[in-house]
Amino acid sequence: MIIPLISDLLALCKLKVVALILLTAEVGMFLAVPAPYLPNGLLVLSASIGISMAAASAAVFNHVVDEQIDAQMSRTNKRPLPQGKVSRNQALMWGVFLGLVGLGILQLFVNTITMVLTFVSLIGYAIIYTLYLKRATPQNIVIGGAAGAAPPVLGWTAVSGTQGIEYACLLFLIVFIWTPPHFWALAIHRVEEYKKVDVPMLPVTHGLAYTRTQILLYTVLLLLVSLLPYLASMSGLIYLVVAIALGIRFLMYAIKIYNNPDDKRIAWCTFVYSINYLMLLFVTLLFDHYWLILPLEVF
């Protein structure tokens, strides 16, 4: 009884999404200190736990708010709440617990600015996006993307406060521009389900042709924005080469979507690639930051 419940509670946390959030946050932490130094290990651990718990809390609240929608979509109807494996009250208590503990850790062991920014991001995703924007406007992903793009900034401020935060904003901008083509590709793949539950995703309100064009334009913009860390002398040639290669590959997927309007399989492949794109881009940022430095010293 207890073990299945724990498994279901963890399923509410969207652990794969949290892992990607944590990756971008930790890259922000390490880039916040100059090579060859490393950020304090205990600080990194505390910030990682706090940010992860807050992200998991936001995911739980997303499940609670979207319970009725999830029950009607084949992609989500096996989730714990629609299946009745977890009650609404249990989910709410779990979400509150994760949020309070996560924010408490950030306040006690990291710093106030990171706690405040994390709280704002949690509210932005769990309430402003999930409760209002998602159901109110086809630009829900664009506006709500600010909350999802915050983790690199949270990681940066956890280590360096506001010092050099303009560089963290470049990382924020990359994730912010990445978000629309990432989610719109999924929306094209699942457009009939979004129509069924009356969620005004862009393909539902403006049609597939318009959405394909927007994905293409945003992907071009993402390729350009991804070069900013190099242009700002934040990264070197390794990052530049990889960013261009990853961006061109993403653009090829966007062109395929544009040229194959009836093949939703391509949209799904684009969605999957976009996740790999972001992971590889941020790992490359970290590798480029340290690759010439041996041995490393603890900051």
UniProtKB/Swiss-Prot annotation:
Its EC number is 2.5.1.141. It catalyses: heme b + (2E,6E)-farnesyl diphosphate + H2O = Fe(II)-heme o + diphosphate. Keywords: Cell inner membrane, Cell membrane, Heme biosynthesis, Membrane, Transferase, Transmembrane, Transmembrane helix. GO terms for molecular function: protoheme IX farnesyltransferase activity. One of its GO terms (biological process) is heme O biosynthetic process. It comes from the Bacteria. Gene3D superfamilies: UbiA prenyltransferase. The keyword Cell membrane applies. Converts heme B (protoheme IX) to heme O by substitution of the vinyl group on carbon 2 of heme B porphyrin ring with a hydroxyethyl farnesyl side group. This is Protoheme IX farnesyltransferase.
